[in-house]
Amino acid sequence: MDLGVRMHGRVMLAAAVALSLSACGGGGGGGGGFPTPTPTPTPTPTPTPTLASLGTPSQVVQEMAPGINLGNTLDAVDTWDTMPYSDSKETVWGNPPANQAIFNAYAAAGFKSVRIPVTWYQYADSNNTIAPFWLARVKQVVDYARNAGLYVILNVHHDGAWLIPDTAHQAAADARLKSFWTQIANEFKDYDNHLLFAGTNEIAMPNTYTTPTQENCTVQKGFNQTFVDAVRATGGNNASRTLVVQLYSTNIDYGPDTCGETTLPSDSVANRLMIEMHWYSPFDFTINSNNTTIWQWGALATDLSAVETWGNEGYTRQEFDKAMTDFVNKGVPVIMGEFGSYPKDTGPGQGNETYTNYWAQYNTYAAVTRGIVPMWWDTGSILDRNTGAVKDAGLINALTTGMTTNPEPVSAVGNANND
């Protein structure tokens, strides 16, 4: 997410890379009277089932859920006036360099996919050429994830400052987006469909999350089309790679009803597109650390003055039903690329993990039962980013248990789950 990015270290992953498909060649001349060896035919490998063949939303959920984000790492931004950077800035927001241990730990904890947010602009020159060292570093991190058996989603993340969805900025933004995705896609063109690309992140007009105009919708959908066209043009496995395109501001309310039925871009291959939404509702409970009065949620609430009158279980069902109706029921898988709710640091609700974990489990369950892949936004609070040691077993349990178990009590307190 782009809201202040850290929020006391808790900002608001991904699905995996791949088998390199590198072919080894050997040769050698004969001589000295030795007979020429008969070449041994190379057997055709049996394709690994991937999203190239598993296309229904329910199959995608089985393959990829639950997911997690490697947040505040490759997306981290240092001072803007020193760009382009000549070395990695992935540690400037407090996390260690990404390593194999953390991805092994994600897999061991029960996560099946990881979203790897990456900011590219800060490593690109005036011709939009991304520094080779940065492409190599991102590739190394993607390989860590694949080595752990995870699906990976790789995106263009904190680049929204130049991806402005209006006609005044459209041409320049499209040109840069095309250049970036051409370079990224070429770097990974031999990776199989365990690696997914996601074109943009939370595109909206600067400093506003209000309802978009038709101009905003049209330009933002144009960014999706530019992304798809750029990736497909690179060929290789990118010709059929699964690609993730976003709703305006990643808000399910800004789907077909707001921005029109042509939400999905055209594509040269069928059934290889997913839609991405994000979910942090209700804001004052989930991520607004400045609000200390709203610290309970849903049917577990014991103090109705500490819970929002909206945004509880009923609202979750209502909004996720929109995603199911607009996309899942039409055969288009949906990625909830970010969602999260974090304990309060101060006030009467300090340490309110009972409620935040309940939110995590309920929203996971509500998502997967509607064909939506939930991916938790994590910035290092769940697992130790150096060693992979578990830091928050309660949250991990909530996210993994939510895959199959609805935590909602039979009876609710007040009207908390009837909104």
Where do the language-model regions lie?
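Bacterial N-terminal signal peptides that target proteins for export
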Residues: M1-L13
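C-terminal motif of bacterial Sec signal peptides marking the signal peptidase cleavage site
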Residues: S20-A23
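Bacterial lipoprotein signal-peptidase II cleavage site
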Residues: G25-P35
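N-terminal carbohydrate-binding accessory modules
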Residues: T36-S113, D326
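Acidic/histidine-rich helix-loop elements
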Residues: G71-A98, S126-I130, A168-H169, D284-Y315
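An active-site-proximal structural segment forming one wall of the substrate-binding cleft
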Residues: W93-S113, A124, N128-H158, W162-G199, ...
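Active-site region of glycoside hydrolase catalytic domains
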Residues: A175-N312, D321-S341, T369-I372
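Aromatic-rich peripheral "rim/lid" segments of glycoside hydrolase catalytic domains that contact
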Residues: T346-D419
